[in-house]
C-alpha cells in the first residue's frame, strides 16, 4: 500500500502523530533521503539554496535560563557580557554588506525575554523597514511578543519572526525553566495572527531522544499553515553553559532531521543552521539532498563561529548552485 511518505505529491497534512513522524525518522537512511529528495523536488528547485545572514543586534544579559545559550545571564562563566542595542545605521550597514555578498534574507537577533515598547522597539522597527528597503527579506528574533507588537512588526514589513520551540514538549523542561512551551506557542500564534511568516525549528544534541525530536516536528507540522521556514540546529556546546560537555551530534542525525522535516512540511524552507561548521562538505551536501534549502552565510551566528563565506561559496559552486553575490564581487576586483 502506498503511504504519504512514498508520494511526493501527497496532500499537505496537519494531522501527523508522533509515531508516524518517528517511523519516518527511523527509516533506513538511504530510503529516507530518497523519499525526502522526491518530496523536495516536487515542491522546490533543488538549486535554490537561500543564503541568509544573521546578526546579533543586542548581545548578552538575557534573563532566560536556556541551558544551551551563552547569552543567558544565568551562565556568567560563558563570558558574554550584556551589550546595548546596536544603532540602526550600523545594523543597516551590516545588511548592505550581507546583500553585496549574496544574502537575500537578513536576520536580526536580540537577547531579550520580551521587547519593551519604547525607543528600543522603535529602533527595531526602523531596522526592519531599512532591511526591507534594501530589497531583502527581514527576520527578527526578540523573544516573546504581544499581539500589538506583532502587528507593529507586520506594519514595518517584517517577512518572518523566528521563535524556536527548541525541542519536544516532554523534554523542554530539562532545558528551560523561565519560559513555558505555552509561552512559545502563544507568541507563534500572535505572529500568525499578524500575518507574519513563522520561522520555527529546534536544536538536536541536547540529550533528547528520537521521540522528542519527532514530537517537536509534530507540533510544527500540525500548525496550519506550516511554518514558512524551519531551522534545524545541532547543539554548539559552549564552555560555561550547562550543556558544555555534551558530545557532538552525529552528522547523520542532522541529515535525518532535515529529511523528516522536509517530508512532513513539504513547502517550508528547511534551514541548515547552527552546528553546520562541524559538518564535512559531504555531510552538508547530503543535507541538501535530503531537503535542506537554506544556510546562514557569514562567519558568525550570533555569538558562535560559522563557516567561512568563501568556503560556502565554493561548496555551492561545486554542487551547481549559483552564487551571484560572490560572483559580482569577484568580477569587480
From Swiss-Prot:
Q: Which residues bind [2Fe-2S] cluster?
A: 107, 139, 199, 271
Does the keyword Membrane belong to this entry?
no
Q: Which GO terms describe its molecular function?
A: 2 iron, 2 sulfur cluster binding; 4 iron, 4 sulfur cluster binding; biotin synthase activity; iron ion binding
Which residues are involved in binding [4Fe-4S] cluster?
Answer: 62, 66, 69
Chemical reaction(s) catalysed: (4R,5S)-dethiobiotin + (sulfur carrier)-SH + 2 reduced [2Fe-2S]-[ferredoxin] + 2 S-adenosyl-L-methionine = (sulfur carrier)-H + biotin + 2 5'-deoxyadenosine + 2 L-methionine + 2 oxidized [2Fe-2S]-[ferredoxin]
- Give yes or no: UniProt keyword Iron-sulfur: yes
The note describing how and how many cofactors are bound reads: Binds 1 [4Fe-4S] cluster. The cluster is coordinated with 3 cysteines and an exchangeable S-adenosyl-L-methionine. Binds 1 [2Fe-2S] cluster. The cluster is coordinated with 3 cysteines and 1 arginine.
Domain of life of the source: Bacteria
> Could you tell me the keywords of this UniProt record?
2Fe-2S, 4Fe-4S, Biotin biosynthesis, Iron, Iron-sulfur, Metal-binding, S-adenosyl-L-methionine, Transferase
Q: What is its EC number?
A: 2.8.1.6
Q: Which residues form the Radical SAM core domain?
A: 47-276
A Gene Ontology biological process in which this protein takes part is: biotin biosynthetic process
Annotated pathway, please?
A: Cofactor biosynthesis; biotin biosynthesis; biotin from 7,8-diaminononanoate: step 2/2
List required co-factors: [4Fe-4S] cluster; [2Fe-2S] cluster
Q: How does it assemble?
A: Homodimer.
Q: Provide the function of this protein.
A: Catalyzes the conversion of dethiobiotin (DTB) to biotin by the insertion of a sulfur atom into dethiobiotin via a radical-based mechanism.
PANTHER family given in the database record: BIOTIN SYNTHASE, BIOTIN SYNTHASE, MITOCHONDRIAL
Q: Which family does it belong to?
A: Belongs to the radical SAM superfamily. Biotin synthase family.
Q: Per its record, how is this protein called by name?
A: Biotin synthase
Q: Which species is listed as the source?
A: Methylobacterium nodulans (strain LMG 21967 / CNCM I-2342 / ORS 2060)
